[in-house]
Each structure stands twice: as C-alpha cells, then as structure tokens.
Amino acid sequence: MIFITGTDTGIGKTYVSSILAENLKKMGINVGYLKPVETGGREDTLTLKNILNTDDDLDLMNPINLKLPLSPNIAFDVENSPLTLDEIKEKIKNAYETLKEKYDFLIVEGAGGVCVPIKEDFLMSDLIKFLGLDAVVVSRPNLGTINHTLLTVEHLRNKGINVRGVIINCITDLSEVLYYEKTFETIEKVGNIEIIGIVKSREDFEIDFEKILR
C-alpha cells in the first residue's frame, strides 16, 4: 500500500498513479485505487476506474466528493456539508479497509499538496498518518522544485511519515530544463531522499517498482 502525494496541485499525481496502476496490473498484481477526497467532480477517480477496469463503486473509490474545485476545507464550508471531521475520517477508513481486503496492493492518492486542509486543521499529511501509510512524492523538474520537494519531504518526516522516494513527473520536457541532473542530485543529497522514478511520458518512464511495492 502506498500514498501518492505531491508538491502541489496539478503536479501529476493522478497521471503517475495511473502509470503505476497500469503497469502493476500488467505485472499480474491485483491492484486497487482509492481517492479519499476529490473536489471538482470525479475526474481522477474515473480515470483510474477506467484504467483498472474495475467494478468498484465510485463511492467506495472516492468516499468524500465535493462539487467545487476548491481546497477541501473551503469546499466543505461553501457547500454547507453537514459531515463532521470524525464522520469524514470514518468514511475514508471504511473505504480503505474494504479495498485493502480486496486487493493485494492499493494506491491511495491525495488531493493537492501535503498541507492542504481537509476539514478544520486536519491536513492531507494527517490523513496519510491516520491511514498508517508510507508516501511517495510526485514532483516536477522545473526551477523551484528543489525548495518545493525538500519542504514537502521535511513536512512528511516531521509528521512521522516514511517517504519512500520522489517521482519526477516531467510536465516540462527535460530538454528545456537547464542542468536538471544537478537539480535531481541536489534533491537527493540535501533531502537525503532517493528519486525512484522519472516519468517523461506514459510510454517513456523509469520507475523502481520494488520501492513502490516493498
């Protein structure tokens, strides 16, 4: 089981999750997907449902769904949701336990970055801790990624969460990124964290699946 988080929203968590799911399935692994919280519809959940060709109910794969494309805590307020934090945690936990029993491996994908509030002061990182999962951080190769990646890893570690590694999602072609190798070296050295994957496209990627599955 693994929790896929990222340095920001729109960083490619769903894209990377879909590549992981697709290839783990090709390896013969019975893999499932959980998106505990999704705002702005169910596009991410539907993407993985189609890739995995699963009959899992959408309400199971995505127990907390909010209509507006906002931070979950703001969407809860604006939509006047009656759900309490305890009820939210219970719904997510029940979905997680159900899927965990059904599958050999479960990909759990967050929403936004690690510090986005879900409800009140309960952050996405608190959800990772609540579920007792290790994390993989999806990052980008562009200028600024050193700061964003190291801050994300440090925050997770300060919460007592084990970070298995970083996957670089090339939202910008590497040929357009100056000295990206040195950027990656800096992340690994300063953050004492391994880059376990580089995704250039759905067909062109290098991922250490052993680190994902361990």
Swiss-Prot record:
Its cofactor is Mg(2+). It catalyses: (7R,8S)-7,8-diammoniononanoate + CO2 + ATP = (4R,5S)-dethiobiotin + ADP + phosphate + 3 H(+). Mg(2+) binds at residues 14, 44, 109. It is an enzyme of class 6 (ligase). InterPro entries: DTB_synth_BioD, P-loop_NTPase. It is found in: Cytoplasm. The active site is at residue 35. ATP binds at residues 10-15, 44, 109-112, 169-170. Homodimer. Belongs to the dethiobiotin synthetase family. Catalyzes a mechanistically unusual reaction, the ATP-dependent insertion of CO2 between the N7 and N8 nitrogen atoms of 7,8-diaminopelargonic acid (DAPA, also called 7,8-diammoniononanoate) to form a ureido ring. PANTHER family: DETHIOBIOTIN SYNTHETASE. This is ATP-dependent dethiobiotin synthetase BioD. The gene is bioD.
